[in-house]
């Protein structure tokens, strides 16, 4: 019995592992780095490219590129390097021996799914593969088949209504505001405090500050008042060089931009309005089920206080008396991967794989018929 591989390629992090496991074995940055300078030491074995953590640790001498932008693959050569690294260095498996389940962003262009399929069968010789929509997997991981998923990662945020296991494409909304934008915004507002962060390497420090210290205020204006009148909300953070910085209202001003994108100079609706708009695009008969099953997934939904704030905002927009439930599972950072692990190990799923034989007969377009 061969174990399937599950690979969730996010804009910021790649999560990979084996079907049936309860967590991914490998989680590493979706980065490919290339040296900025010519190597001078002969025989040092300098590589022309580095992937993931190795690229991250050598970031001072590299130019870092993310092949996945806003959840969609934009650079296939680099993407191939990431998959190669996933199979051979992280999971240490021969890809030609295992079926592989890949994930894709909602509303992924058709040509992209075909390209993924082609690379798996032609470059890696996979025996079988499948492409699943990320938000649907998150819903499976929460034990549901109907609900609306607010999936927010590093590169993109989507609201995806799902009914009986099928995503409803006409009601899916995308918001190009996610973790990376919040990190950039935090860099900007820390600069106003007199701390300067500019390089790609320093951006990673700010990302860490964001992950450790930021939270969502239940009432933004009230929180701003508290922050102005006392130092109770201030926290300190030690930089790698030993310098200690203090951060106050930036802690909640940064993630507030999820609810008020105007902070970032964007005209779009916040995540609460986007979720509401997505529900309103659905058939009136299923809205009740969506309000009662609003599932959060992705790393950018990990801020403390986000579920309570979401509950408050949706309640104020929804019809009065509507039962509203925001589900924020503790493992939601990896719920897409976990859903993939569950799906790929179901006995009923085994007939869903696209086999190498089917691919050879029909070509890349087979993916549209078998994966939906």
Curated annotation (Swiss-Prot):
Record-linked Pfam families: Actin
Keywords annotated in UniProt: ATP-binding, Cytoplasm, Cytoskeleton, Hydrolase, Nucleotide-binding
Class of this enzyme: hydrolase
GO (cellular component) term, any one: cytoskeleton
UniProt-recorded Gene Ontology molecular function terms: ATP binding; hydrolase activity
Compartmental location: Cytoplasm, Cytoskeleton
Listed name of the protein: Actin
PROSITE patterns recorded: ACTINS_1, ACTINS_2, ACTINS_ACT_LIKE
Gene3D superfamilies: 3.30.420.40, Actin, Chain A, domain 4 (3.90.640.10)
Function: Actins are highly conserved proteins that are involved in various types of cell motility and are ubiquitously expressed in all eukaryotic cells.
Family: Belongs to the actin family.
Segments crossing the lipid bilayer: none
Top-level taxon of the source organism: Eukaryota
EC number from the UniProt entry: 3.6.4.-
The species this protein was found in: Lumbricus rubellus (Humus earthworm)
Chief location bin: cytoplasm
Reaction catalysed by this enzyme: ATP + H2O = ADP + phosphate + H(+)
Listed InterPro entries: Actin, Actin/actin-like_CS, Actin_CS, ATPase_NBD
